[in-house]
């Protein structure tokens, strides 16, 4: 009888437990509404940490909107007894205001609205971005005058940006709170970052990965002819933003990337049999974190030594690990010229007009390398002058220093030599000295932050392509494809869900907003984490520089027989296009511990914390009187439930001897 009673009790407990779990999930779904959001994450440095993190389990509070000077000043006398989640209109989200608010009154977290953009120039980057890793670490120039260094601050509370539609809703609900109406609204912000202390500690504990990615280089030549000089046409591919999922970086990188890929499309149609120079197009990753991609490439050109080839792939090295050795075709001493496009999306109106009454815009030459650089400037100037209605013209900078640029990685290596062989270097920008980009490193460096005059974009592609063809030995006869330029511009500056992505990619992006934050390198030297934007650019470059095809009925790239080939519509496309590791030389992989370690602190040290998930959830809060009523009601319900249970127990025990 006792055993029977035991099973009955167990059965009742299981039924009640299942019901409680189901009810708990149902109640939670009714209490909370998840919001589309973009977190501020945490990055560890050599000496500490930057970015944001919530407490374990998240932080919550009542929403308080800051959208005017009055609401900002009222915040400090706000009598709300509960914790506060500050909702920032974008105009009030900057380093000065956030630090003042946090230092004077408890702030449990922050939500930033994106429905209305800033009405003033602002950059969360430094005034001289990554100066310590460049060519002039002691420079007094401030290239980025709107910068306040907000990105490099550390905050012990969570911050999220909200997507457009969500921002409109939260703005309205926060206004209800401020007006003192009920029900009030609160939010729970959960972005707990596992990393802590500094980069060394975080790596040792296994809670971080190095910031990095994959650079891309490409050539029309099937094999690099080592007897020919090399023209290196390049740009930084990555961008930054305080909320890294919103790092569109249209003027930082996206516009120039549009130009470079359009140049590949243009130059694929020219007669390259007359070229007496090799032309290599390179797109460096993780440049915004200390010129990581370009520095790594230069170091590998000069110092990489494979001691053991991969037995299954003679173009891959097993020790030290290197998946693709094709870069060994490139000799550093063969580099004849470097041409870099760096922030070219906001050229200044010169005040002049073309014969057909179009505005003419100025691009700026930043030369280095004496006579070689002068030759490059001459060719580009002659190319634009050869077009009667060209809407771009060039002027030479008034500065003696190069702006922050990837070319510095090559020049630093040249300067180490006792008898340097100067490489003619030309950096082309939209600014002479201080950036024309008012939102460098900010979420508002988007498609609305660039020159939208299509004729200027077309003319850049035409003039740049003609110049490269002439420098390589061609006759300068080029024809641009206006439709391709328009389409690829949309892909890289507005929506990564364009037709070219559909054609070339087997996967589709979760977020349509182009995001050029480099991300993390990966868990080991051969296990990379490559974002869809980087993969798309690689496939686009491969498609545009293909030198042969093979109809194999392939279903994936694995069905094609080289790492520089891709499968498109059941056809393998072969190209001399390759990934190259973009990871700081500060790191080395310890195989015995299966973890990254810091081996050279003279190079950039940035590692990103791991996290399980991030979320923002909205909930309602009743008035004080309502909360008291719910508490009393709950206690009454509890007492009644306990009484009923005791009565049933007594009844069953007496009547059926069950308990």
Curated annotation (Swiss-Prot):
Glycans are attached at residues 94, 172, 305, 389, 451, 475, 550, 553, 600. Keywords: Glycoprotein, Membrane, Notch signaling pathway, Signal, Transmembrane, Transmembrane helix. It is found in: Membrane. It is a single-pass type I membrane protein. Residues 649-659 are cytoplasmic. Disulfide bonds: none annotated. Residues 23-627 are extracellular. Coiled coil: none annotated. GO terms for biological process: autophagy; macropinocytosis; membrane protein ectodomain proteolysis; Notch signaling pathway; phagocytosis; protein processing; sorocarp spore cell differentiation. Essential subunit of the gamma-secretase complex, an endoprotease complex that catalyzes the intramembrane cleavage of integral membrane proteins such as Notch receptors and APP (amyloid-beta precursor protein). It probably represents a stabilizing cofactor required for the assembly of the gamma-secretase complex. This is Nicastrin. The gene is ncstn.
